[in-house]
Amino acid sequence: MSVTVETLENLERKVVLSLPWSEINAETDKKLKQTQRRAKIDGFRPGKAPLKMIAQMYGASAQNDVINELVQRRFHDVAVAQELKVAGFPRFEGVEEQDDKESFKVAAIFEVFPEVVIGDLSAQEVEKVTASVGDAEVDQTVEILRKQRTRFNHVEREARNGDRVIIDFEGKIDGEPFAGGASKNYAFVLGASQMLPEFEAGVVGMKAGESKDVTVNFPEDYHGKDVAGKTAVFTITLNNVSEATLPEVDADFAKALGIADGDVAKMREEVQKNVSREVERRVNEQTKESVMNALLKAVELKAPVALVNEEAARLANEMKQNFVNQGMADAANLDLPLDMFKEQAERRVSLGLILAKLVDENKLEPTEEQIKAVVANFAESYEDPQEVIDWYYADPSRLQAPTSLAVESNVVDFVLGKAKVNEKALSFDEVMGAQA
């Protein structure tokens, strides 16, 4: 099969496929005869309509189907014969100059995978993040857990920061009400930044049953464009004040966190274990991000446009599905521009190609034991870890995510063993983010 592969721009290639008319016609005749056997046409018994009539009715569509099938088959044969590593799907175009009456020509335009050459990893710098979890971090986490279980009790006094208040309010701009500017029995916690600072400051010091006018200046960058940069006067009536009460760290508190016998020491051990696991996950993610950035620097790579577009479309669909899962039913019909996802898609495709090369060259495929360790780590935070492990192993497709993580872990370890590693110790707050 003599076919010339023409190089276009970057990774794009072109081949012209010749389909003999004799083959097209023979395959078309075969398809029409198959159609004849199934056809139900008025005036004829099933399968007994004349072939000539079948050809008149279905000949054009049958020939198009045959040409499409032959083009796909011929392109596959050419790709195998020429050892072409095709990325994505080809597009087929008609050839204007059909100079050979014996055959029909079609141009196949496609991309090939780039050659991936891993650069000198010893020249790359990688940041390895570390963090520790001690008694202070456990205390901090327990305090967060206490705040999450705050109870509010009604009090007869003026409102203070930290109280939950229930109010009626109506806002006006230049004496006129505005959309979203009024509500009844609206509850919020003072000092939690749920409302604008001037609004909250106006409520502090009020008692149940009191009303007052509070002037509020909306910021220029306020999310409500109709009121951004404007001044409103809110008439506020305070209906109820409730004081926050945090639970004591005792047996009842420990039981609420899943410690059956209420042992506070066991609870702290469990908190430390869970927090340590989460801290480890986060520092590993940051280290992995640094490793991936180093790999992108070490490899000059142009990702195939077809694969980038496919990944961008997948990311768009993923975002729409997330919206749907959050209750936005109409999100499935959103027309999200793929350009929103192109940068992320290009990074993912490039890293996929680099990792595949690195794993293949350095035999970094994970062992069964490594995959089992990842699954066990997933399961550890659940009430019945064995049930979770059994779920993963009940369907081999469910092991794809653990396998990918095991591969990435091997890659990270490999790069850390080659690159210049700078250790960076982070505090608990830096790792976990600000948690009040």
Curated annotation (Swiss-Prot):
Disulfide bonds: none annotated. Residues 162-247 form the PPIase FKBP-type domain. The keyword DNA-binding does not apply. Keywords: Cell cycle, Cell division, Chaperone, Cytoplasm, Isomerase, Rotamase. Its EC number is 5.2.1.8. GO terms for molecular function: peptidyl-prolyl cis-trans isomerase activity; protein folding chaperone; ribosome binding. One of its GO terms (biological process) is chaperone-mediated protein folding. It catalyses: [protein]-peptidylproline (omega=180) = [protein]-peptidylproline (omega=0). Its main location: cytoplasm. It is found in: Cytoplasm. SUPFAM superfamilies: FKBP-like, Triger factor/SurA peptide-binding domain-like, Trigger factor ribosome-binding domain. GO terms for cellular component: cytoplasm. InterPro entries: PPIase_dom_sf, PPIase_FKBP_dom, Trig_fac, Trigger_fac_C, Trigger_fac_C_sf, Trigger_fac_ribosome-bd_bac, Trigger_fac_ribosome-bd_sf, Trigger_fact/SurA_dom_sf. Signal peptide: none annotated. Belongs to the FKBP-type PPIase family. Tig subfamily. Consists of 3 domains; the N-terminus binds the ribosome, the middle domain has PPIase activity, while the C-terminus has intrinsic chaperone activity on its own. Involved in protein export. Acts as a chaperone by maintaining the newly synthesized protein in an open conformation. Functions as a peptidyl-prolyl cis-trans isomerase. PANTHER family: TRIGGER FACTOR CHAPERONE AND PEPTIDYL-PROLYL CIS/TRANS ISOMERASE, TRIGGER FACTOR-LIKE PROTEIN TIG, CHLOROPLASTIC. This is Trigger factor. It comes from Neisseria meningitidis serogroup C (strain 053442).
